[in-house]
């Protein structure tokens, strides 16, 4: 028996996160701060899968905190997402449309993606 995931796409910016839930078709905006992210993650079901576009360093807090809470997290390259948008005939490029596109991408292509996991501790020391 396959357990279905609760799929959420999150568009990340320096100041704000915009999420879109595939199952409920609801959008939500929150500040890109650890306290706000923590509150938002606490509201998500345990079987949530989150798809995020790699955005400089602004996505790291969300990705790391979601991973620590046990969520499946998928980090997508912006170039890959841009090509996916073109492939499905998408033209809009807003935070809300990006969040929706990320959720759709994970829903349709998720079986081909590998969940994110933190790099080895030695990597942090090298930086």
Feature roles, as predicted:
Residues 1-127:
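Phosphate- and other anionic-substrate recognition elements at nucleic-acid/protein interfaces
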């Amino acid at each position: 028996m396959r357990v279905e995931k609760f799929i959420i796409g999150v568009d990340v910016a320096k100041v704000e996160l915009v999420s879109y839930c595939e199952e409920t078709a609801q959008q939500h905006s929150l500040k890109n701060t650890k306290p706000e992210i923590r509150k938002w993650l606490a509201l998500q079901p345990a079987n949530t899968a989150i798809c995020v576009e790699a955005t400089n360093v602004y996505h790291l807090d969300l990705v790391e905190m979601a991973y620590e809470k046990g969520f499946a997290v998928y980090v997508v390259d912006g170039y890959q997402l841009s090509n996916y948008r073109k492939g499905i005939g998408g033209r809009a490029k807003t935070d809300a449309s990006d969040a929706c596109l990320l959720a759709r991408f994970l829903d349709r292509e998720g079986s081909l993606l590998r969940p994110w996991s933190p790099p080895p501790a030695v990597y942090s020391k090298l930086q």
